[in-house]
């Protein structure tokens, strides 16, 4: 789907769905498979532009990726090779940052770039810790922005104490540590998503976790099988809509419920949503469950501190849901939203205010008073997939009034089937 889109759907939302595979796990399955000693078989890989970027990158480094039935098979090269051209990561910050860590220890010259949005996203936070390991890195605008030039060289292990919890920075350092001499440790102020640690351990890499510290030593993964659960960041749009839209009930099956990613479920519970889990199990090292949310009378809450890394990507649609909650919802410690694909605090604040929301922005968050009836509005998505999908949810809460999204091509970044699934859940949707 490309170009602008006029949303005129009507709720409630009712039904049972599966959302596509988790984007974070999909990236790692391809990349770790390319680093391995044997082939990796992946089931449920997300078919979206961000993951396509990682696939192209690992192929440029010598890996072979092929489809076999419902699985994707990653066959690693004997050793990663210098890419023959600039590696284009598209809109994927995960691809660029994790590859920066890997390529720091791979002999040769690599240049990592991306689209206009990615080239505005910060990379110094990755470059500085990798340099402490001996990496030879440079980037545009005083090492602040991509492209990133990597000259692979021998690395040494280091202890990194991060000021901001970031799974991407942590993962870049741990992956560089696989090529380094000695141990590499990352210490975070709060726990970020731990898919890297889980997958590396599942592929035979010794990983030591001690509270907020993670340590690896030089090793090469052995490959294996990865079964990707549904992405909770994608499910968030339907779960938040169901909680706020009277008469709604939505079940998302086979959903990833890794504890480092379930901040959204905690917030839904704190706001009074009717939420339940069933069929809880663990597959290939990742917890999953069927999650059901029913509409309820929501109330405001305070969101901040250690929970923020566990729901940072879901906060835009949480802001939409908060407009329908009685009382005041306050989000703090979320400054990271300002350096995503867009400044998501500014983008959502502007869009919701124009739709009639009572919202006050802070440097690191916002306060929203509710409940407030929303109205139709024209929205600048700023080429940000989560802004587009969040405001499609806002349209449902606007009593069927039209919301015009100026560009929805960005949704293909993470969730190409979003609008089709939304239509299937809507009664009288279009």
Swiss-Prot record:
- InterPro entries hit by this protein: Enolpyruvate_Tfrase_dom (IPR001986), Enolpyruvate_Tfrase_sf (IPR036968), EPSP_synthase (IPR006264), EPSP_synthase_CS (IPR023193), RNA3'P_cycl/enolpyr_Trfase_a/b (IPR013792)
UniProt binding sites for phosphoenolpyruvate: 23, 93, 121, 168, 344, 386
Provide the E.C. number(s) assigned to this enzyme. 2.5.1.19
> Residues in the active site?
313 (proton acceptor)
Q: Which UniProt keywords apply?
A: Amino-acid biosynthesis, Aromatic amino acid biosynthesis, Cytoplasm, Transferase
Where found in the cell?
A: Cytoplasm
Which residues of this UniProt protein bind 3-phosphoshikimate?
A: 23-24, 28, 166, 168, 313, 340
GO molecular function ontology, one term from the record: 3-phosphoshikimate 1-carboxyvinyltransferase activity
Keyword Cytoplasm among record annotations: yes
Identify the main location: cytoplasm
Q: In which pathway does it act?
A: Metabolic intermediate biosynthesis; chorismate biosynthesis; chorismate from D-erythrose 4-phosphate and phosphoenolpyruvate: step 6/7
Q: Name one GO cellular component term.
A: cytoplasm
Q: Which domain of life is it from?
A: Bacteria
Q: Name one GO biological process term.
A: aromatic amino acid family biosynthetic process
Which reaction does this enzyme catalyse, per its entry? 3-phosphoshikimate + phosphoenolpyruvate = 5-O-(1-carboxyvinyl)-3-phosphoshikimate + phosphate
Which PANTHER family does UniProt cross-reference here? AROM/DEHYDROQUINATE SYNTHASE, PENTAFUNCTIONAL AROM POLYPEPTIDE
> Subunit arrangement?
Monomer.
Q: Which family does it belong to?
A: Belongs to the EPSP synthase family.
NCBIfam families listed in its UniProt record: aroA
Q: What does this protein do?
A: Catalyzes the transfer of the enolpyruvyl moiety of phosphoenolpyruvate (PEP) to the 5-hydroxyl of shikimate-3-phosphate (S3P) to produce enolpyruvyl shikimate-3-phosphate and inorganic phosphate.
The protein, known as? 3-phosphoshikimate 1-carboxyvinyltransferase
Q: What is the lineage of its organism?
A: Bacteria, Pseudomonadati, Myxococcota, Myxococcia, Myxococcales
